[in-house]
Curated annotation (Swiss-Prot):
CDD domains xrefs: ABC_DR_subfamily_A
Pfam family, one: ABC_tran
Highest taxon listed in the record's lineage: Bacteria
Organism annotation: Synechocystis sp. (strain ATCC 27184 / PCC 6803 / Kazusa)
PANTHER family per record: ABC TRANSPORTER ATP-BINDING PROTEIN ALBC-RELATED
Annotated Gene3D superfamilies: P-loop containing nucleotide triphosphate hydrolases (3.40.50.300)
Domain ABC transporter: from-to ranges: 48-285
The family this protein is said to belong to: Belongs to the ABC transporter superfamily.
Binding site for ATP: G87, P88, N89, G90, A91, G92, K93, T94
Protein name listed in UniProt: Uncharacterized ABC transporter ATP-binding protein sll0415
InterPro entries per record: AAA+_ATPase (IPR003593), ABC_transporter-like_ATP-bd (IPR003439), ABC_transporter-like_CS (IPR017871), ABC_Transporter_VariousFunc (IPR051782), P-loop_NTPase (IPR027417)
Length: 354
């Protein structure tokens, strides 16, 4: 029994215990008082904030070679925000997450998490974390595993049972399966659901998710999106890495793009992609001179015209008969996040992952 407990404890040292999540004892009770009419509420500090934070690894036989995994980087994530960190493999996304969680130390710069310096033990009681590659003890059931994680957070037995049941419902894990089936028999997608449940069992204020969609089928991805949106409705802050840009575009309030350890851009989707200004129009028929009065950047491929239109859509549709043209398609001109992401990498000559 001692040997098994030691195994469980050491297996999760990187993803959970190494981050110090279970240090610091019980939570203190917070008593809120109403704000007087003449008083102004305090300004809400950013949940996550970094100032020129960086990470350099030393390699080689004599440890005399340096690899700059993360160049000086400054970001801020606000209360209740869903923040997506994007980048190709080797961009430094997981490195940044581990620095924020206190799993590894930064080489330079500083940062805060929930208003406290990175690494504060009491703060880690208020944080949830799903690693990209979580290590599970094969011979435990999901219920036993979640019960163990809850006990590390010093959650009482009855409350643990209630939360485990709620987490299984939330992530779509059948109660019978959770109690009877050992984790070694789970598929990758099912293990990801268990990992999501353990990240939320302590009812965290901020949740860090490293590739939460990894290994999930379309239904599983939909369920994870719904979980993230429900957490957002509860006022929780979500910080996650993902390669699935379509999901990021649906979920995130703000994003940042990393490549080779460098921050390329950050901001809201409207700031990064631009507002919906105009339409990309495809027409068939008509004359160039007449169409040019309506469409900018007009070009022709075979007998089809492509151009950019700004103005009232109905006005263009009404003018088509007089132009002797037929509308083939009309789409908002704003690029997709995937198009923007690829363009940012190509502009910097980045064609492969590092």
């Amino acid at each position: 029994m001692r040997f098994r407990c030691y195994l469980i404890f050491s297996i999760f040292s990187d993803s959970l215990l190494g981050a110090g999540f279970f240090q610091g004892g019980k939570r203190a009770m917070v008593v809120s008082t109403p704000i007087a009419a003449e008083e102004k509420p305090p300004i809400q500090a950013n949940v996550v904030e970094t100032w020129e934070i960086s990470k350099i690894y030393r390699t080689g036989f004599w440890m005399n070679q340096k690899v700059e995994s993360l160049k000086p980087l400054s970001i801020a994530v606000q209360q209740g925000e869903t923040f997506g960190l994007l980048g190709p493999n080797g961009a430094g996304k997981t490195t940044l997450l581990k620095i924020l969680l206190g799993v590894i130390r930064a080489s330079g710069g500083r940062g805060t998490l929930l208003g406290k310096p990175i690494g504060d033990r009491q703060t880690k009681q208020r944080v949830g974390y799903l690693p990209e590659n979580a290590y599970f003890y094969d011979f435990l059931t999901a219920w036993e595993f979640l019960d163990y994680i809850g006990s590390l957070f010093q959650i009482g037995k009855q409350e643990r049972q209630r939360r485990i049941l709620a987490m299984c419902d939330l992530v779509g894990l059948a109660q019978k399966t959770a109690k009877k089936k050992q984790l070694r028999q789970y598929s990758k997608g099912m293990l990801q659901r268990v990992g999501m449940a353990q990240a939320l069992i302590n009812d965290p204020e901020v949740v860090f998710l490293d590739e939460p969609m990894s290994g999930l089928d379309p239904l599983g991805r939909y369920q994870v999106r719904e979980i993230i949106l429900s957490l957002k409705e509860q006022g929780k802050t979500i910080f996650f890495n993902s390669h699935i840009l379509a999901d990021v575009e649906q979920i995130c309030d703000r994003i940042a793009i990393l490549a080779r350890g460098e921050l390329l851009c950050s901001g809201s989707l409207a700031e990064v992609l631009g507002n919906d200004e105009g339409y990309e129009v495809v027409l068939k028929g008509g004359e160039e001179e007449a169409l040019g009065k309506y469409l900018a950047n007009l070009s022709q491929e075979q007998d089809v015209w492509h151009g950019h239109y700004q103005g009232d859509v109905q006005a263009l549709v009404d003018a088509l008969p007089s132009l002797n043209a037929r509308l083939i398609s009309m789409n908002l001109a704003r690029p997709s996040l995937e198009d923007y992401f690829i363009r940012q990498l190509r502009e910097r000559g980045i064609t492969t992952s590092q």
